[in-house]
Amino acid sequence: DLSSAMIEKARERGGYDELVVAELTDYLGLNAAQFDLIVSADTLIYFGDLSALLLRAAHALRPAGWLAFTVEKTDDDADVPGYRLNTNTRYSHSKAYVTQALDAAGFVLRAMSQATIREGDGEPQLGWAVLAQRGSALSSGAPAA
């Protein structure tokens, strides 16, 4: 997490092997082939362009590693190219954009379904629940030297 206060709350709660104060994309870029699985629930709503993050996730995964995440769904998915910043300061993403961004980063989409990802103001917030696997061909998601 970026917030040391949130890390402290997580530390108090317990149950974690490691807690790190870091920006997500930077952290993934510094951990080449370290993970078999990356799970990100309700985090990527703070990213518009997912390209760099997905490249870094592929870089951080071991061969054939898995990536599971959620993003908010655009209201009218067919008419929205890519992603947009909403009035609640969260981004929503179209299905086509997520699919294209995964492919460009070297992932194979294994499952993508509409789901309620959270409740907000008493209303269900619809999103995409995504499961992807790192493909054999991998673009370089390593940090620039």
Where are these regions (language model features)?
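Class I SAM-dependent methyltransferase SAM/SAH-binding core
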Residues: D1-L28
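A short beta-strand submotif of the Rossmann-like class I SAM-dependent methyltransferase core
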Residues: V21, S40-T43
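A short acidic, Gly/Pro-enriched loop at the edge of an enzyme's catalytic core
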Residues: T25-I38
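A short His-aromatic
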Residues: I45-F47
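A short glycine-rich, Lys/Arg-flanked "PGG" loop and its adjoining helix->strand segment in the class I
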Residues: S51-W66
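Short alpha-helix
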Residues: R90-G106, M112
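Core SAM-dependent methyltransferase catalytic element
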Residues: A105, T116-A145
